[in-house]
Swiss-Prot record:
Any Pfam family the entry gives: Lig_chan
Residues annotated to bind glycine: P527, L528, T529, R534, S700, D744
Sorted UniProt keywords: Calcium, Cell membrane, Disulfide bond, Glycoprotein, Ion channel, Ion transport, Ligand-gated ion channel, Magnesium, Membrane, Phosphoprotein, Postsynaptic cell membrane, Receptor, Signal, Synapse, Transmembrane, Transmembrane helix, Transport
InterPro entries: ANF_lig-bd_rcpt, CaM-bd_C0_NMDA_rcpt_NR1, Glu/Gly-bd, Iono_Glu_rcpt_met, Ionotropic_Glu_rcpt, Iontro_rcpt_C, NMDA1-like_ligand-bd, NMDA1-like_N
Ranges for region Disordered: 948-980
Function description: NMDA receptor subtype of glutamate-gated ion channels with high calcium permeability and voltage-dependent sensitivity to magnesium. Mediated by glycine. This protein plays a key role in synaptic plasticity, synaptogenesis, excitotoxicity, memory acquisition and learning. It mediates neuronal functions in glutamate neurotransmission. Is involved in the cell surface targeting of NMDA receptors. Plays a role in associative learning and in long-term memory consolidation.
Glycosylation sites: N255, N311, N342, N394, N451, N478, N498, N690
Gene that encodes the chain: Nmdar1
The protein's name: Glutamate [NMDA] receptor subunit 1
Signal peptide residues on this chain, from the entry's feature table: 1-24
The keyword Phosphoprotein appears for this protein: yes
Record GO cellular component, one term: NMDA selective glutamate receptor complex
Species of origin: Drosophila mojavensis (Fruit fly)
Membrane topology of the entry: Multi-pass membrane protein
Homology family: Belongs to the glutamate-gated ion channel (TC 1.A.10.1) family.
Length: 980
């Protein structure tokens, strides 16, 4: 007994060792269950029997069932009571450990039993595969966490709608849908798919009007009134069969089901009893084939379990509904495997999206005719070669509304259009009406500001190239119009906005383009350049005028100014020449002044040595050499100064020769007509050059520069200089504030033909054309294009060119002016003659100044002479008086001396010292000093001194070496200090 127990224990241990992973080894097939129960909640006994048969056959299909794996069926009948269905699922399915459940539709419409099954099994993460439930609610994975279905939801018909619209080239539709979950889901699917998968804007369908109604309609008349005023005549209808009958009934009363109207409906609306003839509807292939969907769901489940067995371990399914703590992770992973299936089944290609909804479902395109007879005219099916869904429709088999074989246009073609334009000479001239005017001229058309509330905004008249084109176009294709001016005066450009917080930015257009994109206008007749950015959002006709981009600049001035003779040299060079003259003169003076050989004379010559060169002579010499005038005197004397003089002479020769040659080039030779050679000019490409160029902000030219990578540096430079309007830029070119204006060639050629001072530079670049702008999908596009082509062939466009753009007589006068011979005349050299006149006038002025100055000096000298004469006379009078006084004083002293000679002892010393006073010179009084008697006698002796020492009258003796007086004040002849 003990031995037997030990043997069994060894067998169990060996089995455990075999199944446990060793060292992280991969699991084996024996880790997974060998039997799998598949539950079925079906609505009929036939479905149950087919379910059992399918699983029985599946067990013999080795492609889907691995070895030692067996599937068993567990089925219950769908109950119309959802609560009872839930209990049956728990008691009869979950208790049996089902790994998945296949569920069909309820017994009645709106049955909640399939949803109850999904709630119950989803709580335990048991996958559910629906074979007939198509409500949008089952796509919500927050509620139906483990629900898949082999049929697509109703709102997936929006994908087929878009394919049909693309096939028929309908771009504007009206969507009519119910306000329930499915109705809103189909609208959201339509809009999202249209924007995401249809990159071609031309093929993208836009929703003009959305009509939402409450289910269980009684009347649809109110909505039909709005639909009738819309432009689109293509109606997409999602409604129940009952609501569709009300819609079609009221639409027939408003004559909206006949010729020109297109009705495209879903499956439910297709079965209405009064679906209009010519309507197109969709019918899901195999929609009612429960057997096919049961088989596909079983095989999809087997395919997922097989792959899961080979990749991971599958835990057993939950068994108890009462255990709320059950978390079956294998069920969640099995659901992911199911969503990744892609097999070919009885109902077509079976695959699922992230929501578990069937994709690649095929549809039949049904055409209603002959009172509710359905005819298949196309299919939407899976193409295995292209691996995608393909729409195939036989247009010839379709009978449209009103029993028409021809496809309707899909829109109501209006005959009265809102036309916008913009002021742009010569294409559109705008004139404000006077106060006394009530109507425009015959060649003008009223053009108020668009959507302006001010009454004065209506007082404008327009004429020009585009106005004549619009008048002729309206006659040719038969439409009427209201003409208006652009509200903001701009052609329009796009602004990137992100209003919804999405990752991608949205382009929002302004100006004329914005009015067209927002469908507030029908047509733009203006010089509107065709470019890719605009063509993405609006339609363009064929170009009515081909043009490009060119550069406008002011023609280099040919008019000779008074200083035209100075043009050969720049201002800087002239200044340097003037400075050089005086610098050389100064150096010559210094060299001659300090040279030891600057002054010399010949040996054995009595002549004086030569004088050195002074500064004025040096300046005269420098100017004389420069101006090639003869130098007679004042030349350098030293060798060093003469060497510098020779160098200066060579410099002067080169300067004069260069000046003469350039003077001929500036005044005689042909000058270039433009400063720039074109867009490839290095001065435009080089951002360091001080050359201002600009264009108009947000214009087609501005967009062109943004697109061109090779012009990016140039665009960054000119971006800050761009103007708001072309008119402002052209005026600045005329004034010289702007050197180059880059704009459309038509406008610039017109300006150049009107003003001979303006010229276009270089060849055209960025060639494009002017077209008429229309809304996307406008019915007038083809008609306008054909009319413009006819205008080109008939010569009407050429006539407009001659009338408005090329002013022949003005242009011819400009050409004649250019061809006149370039000879020098008084106008060219008037400045030189005026310079000579200025020199003469300057000399005359200087001589007048010298004469006036000399007269002033003479008058001043006369006053000095008079003052000097008066001073001399006064001084003579004073001297005469002093002489008389001195004589009287001597006489008195003499008398005193005689008296003293008789009594010498009685005379005081003071008297003796004053006996012989010192007399001054003859020319004036002198100060007398005691003891100067001898000097007095030697100077002036009216009396002789006898040998006896007595004075006596007699002749004076000749004076010998008279002593100078001790003090002899002098008198000068300059008495200018006495003149007041």
């Amino acid at each position: 007994m003990a031995a037997a127990l030990a043997y069994r224990w060894l067998l169990c241990a060996a089995g455990i060792v075999n199944v446990l992973p060793i060292g992280g080894q991969r699991h084996t097939a024996s880790d997974n269950p060998s039997t799998y129960n598949i539950g079925g909640v079906l609505s009929s006994s036939e479905s149950e029997e087919h379910f059992r048969t399918t699983i029985a056959h599946l067990n013999f299909d080795q492609q889907y069932v691995p070895r030692k794996v067996t599937y068993y069926d567990k089925t219950i009948r769908m109950d119309k009571n959802p609560i009872k269905t839930v209990f049956n699922v728990c008691d009869k399915l979950i208790e049996k450990r089902v790994y998945a459940v296949v569920v069909s539709h309820g017994q009645t419409s709106g049955d909640l039993s399939p949803a109850a099954v999904s709630y119950t099994t989803g709580f335990y993460s048991i996958p559910v595969i629906g074979i007939s439930s198509r409500d949008a609610a089952f796509s919500d994975k927050n509620i139906h966490v483990s629900f898949l279905r082999t049929v697509p939801p109703y709102y997936h018909q929006a994908d087929v709608w878009l394919e049909m619209l693309s096939h028929f080239l309908y771009t504007k539709v009206i969507i009519i849908h119910s306000s329930d979950t499915d109705g809103r889901a189909i609208l959201g699917r339509f809009q999202t798919t249209s924007q995401t998968y249809y990159d071609d804007v031309d093929a993208r369908a836009t929703v003009e009007l959305i009509v939402e109604f409450e289910p269980k309609l009684e009347s649809f008349t109110e909505h039909l009134i709005d639909m009738k005023t819309a432009q689109s005549r293509v109606y997409l209808v999602y409604a129940s069969t009952e609501d569709a009958q009300v819609i079609f009934r009221d639409a027939a009363e408003y004559n909206m089901t006949g010729e020109g109207h297109v009705w495209i409906v879903t499956e439910q609306a297709l079965h209405a009893k009064n679906t209009p003839d010519g309507a197109l509807g969709l019918q899901l292939e195999h929609a009612h084939s429960d057997k096919g969907h049961i088989r596909d769901s079983v095989y999809v489940l087997a395919s997922a379990i097989k792959e899961m067995i080979s990749n991971e371990t599958i835990a057993e399914a939950p068994k108890d509904c009462g255990d709320s703590a059950v978390n079956w992770e294998s069920g969640k992973r099995l659901f992911q495997y199911l969503k990744s299936r892609n097999i070919t089944g009885e109902t077509g290609q079976v695959a699922f999206d992230d929501n578990g909804d069937r994709i690649y479902a095929g549809y039949d395109v049904i055409n209603i005719r002959d009172h509710q007879k359905q005819h298949i005219v196309g299919k939407f099916s899976y193409d295995s070669l292209k691996a995608k869904m393909i729409m195939r429709i036989n247009d010839s088999q379709i009978i449209w509304g009103g029993k028409q074989r021809r496809k309707p246009e899909g829109i109501m073609i209006p005959t009265h259009l809102k036309v916008l334009t913009i002021e742009e000479k010569p294409f559109v001239y705008v004139r404000r009406m006077g106060d006394d005017e009530f109507r425009c001229e015959p060649d003008e058309r009223p053009c108020p500001l668009f959507n302006a509330s001010d009454a004065t905004a209506n007082e404008f008249c327009c004429r020009g190239y585009c106005i004549d084109l619009l008048i002729e176009l309206s006659k040719r294709i038969n439409f009427t119009y209201d003409l208006a001016l652009s509200p903001d005066g701009q052609f329009g450009h796009y602004i990137l906005r992100n209003n919804t917080g999405a990752m991608t930015l949205r382009k929002e257009w302004t100006g004329l383009i914005g009015e067209l994109v927002n469908e507030r206008a029908d047509m733009i007749v203006a010089p509107l350049t065709i470019n890719p950015e605009r063509a993405e959002y609006i339609e363009f006709s064929k170009p009515f005028k081909y043009q490009g981009i060119t550069i406008l600049e002011k023609k280099p001035s040919r008019s000779s100014t008074l200083v035209s003779f100075l043009q050969p040299f720049s201002n800087t060079l002239w200044i340097l020449v003037m400075v050089s003259v005086h610098v050389v003169a100064l150096v010559l003076y210094l060299l001659d002044r300090f040279s030891p050989f600057g002054r010399f004379k010949l040996s054995h010559s009595d002549s004086n040595e030569e004088k050195a060169l002074n500064l004025s002579s040096a300046i005269w010499f420098a100017w004389g050499v420069l101006l090639n005038s003869g130098i007679g005197e004042g030349t350098p004397r030293s060798f060093s100064a003469r060497v510098l003089g020779m160098v200066w002479a060579g410099f002067a020769m080169i300067i004069v020769a260069s000046y003469t040659a350039n003077l001929a080039a500036f005044l005689v030779l042909e000058r270039p007509k433009t400063k720039l050679s074109g867009i490839n000019d290095a001065r435009l490409r080089n951002t360091m050059e001080n050359l201002t160029c600009a264009t108009v902000k947000g214009s087609s030219v501005d967009m062109y520069f943004r697109r061109q990578v090779e012009l990016s540096n140039m665009y960054r430079t000119m971006e800050s200089n761009n103007y708001v309007t072309a008119e402002q830029a052209i005026q600045d070119v005329k004034k010289g504030k702007l050197m180059a204006f880059i704009w459309d060639s038509s406008r610039l050629e017109y300006e150049a033909s009107k003003d001979c001072e303006l010229v276009t530079a270089g060849e055209l670049f960025g060639r494009s054309g002017y077209g008429i702008g229309l809304q996307k999908g406008s019915p007038w596009t083809d008609a306008v294009t054909l009319a413009i082509l006819e205008f080109h062939e008939s010569g009407f466009m050429e006539k407009l060119d001659k009338q408005w753009i090329f002013h022949g007589h003005v242009q011819q006068n400009c050409e004649l002016f250019e061809k006149t011979p370039n000879t020098l005349g008084l106008k060219n050299m008037a400045g030189v003659f005026i310079l000579v006149g200025v020199g003469i006038a300057g000399g005359v002025c200087l001589i007048i100044i010298e004469v006036i100055y000399k007269k002033h000096q003479v008058k001043k000298q006369k006053r000095l002479d008079i003052a000097r004469h008066a001073a001399d006379k006064w001084r003579g009078t004073i001297e005469k008086r002093k002489t008389i006084r001195a004589s009287l004083a001597m006489q008195r002293q003499y008398n005193v001396g005689l008296m003293a000679s008789h009594a010498p002892g009685t005379i005081s010393l003071a008297v003796d010292k004053r006996r012989y006073p010192r007399l001054g010179q003859r020319l004036g009084p002198e100060r007398a000093w005691p003891g100067d008697a001898a000097d007095v006698l030697r100077i002036r002796r009216p009396y002789d001194l006898t040998k006896s020492g007595q004075l006596g009258l007699g002749r004076t003796r000749p004076q010998q070496n008279p002593l100078p007086p001790r003090y002899s004040p002098g008198y000068t002849s300059d008495v200018s200090h006495l003149v007041v």
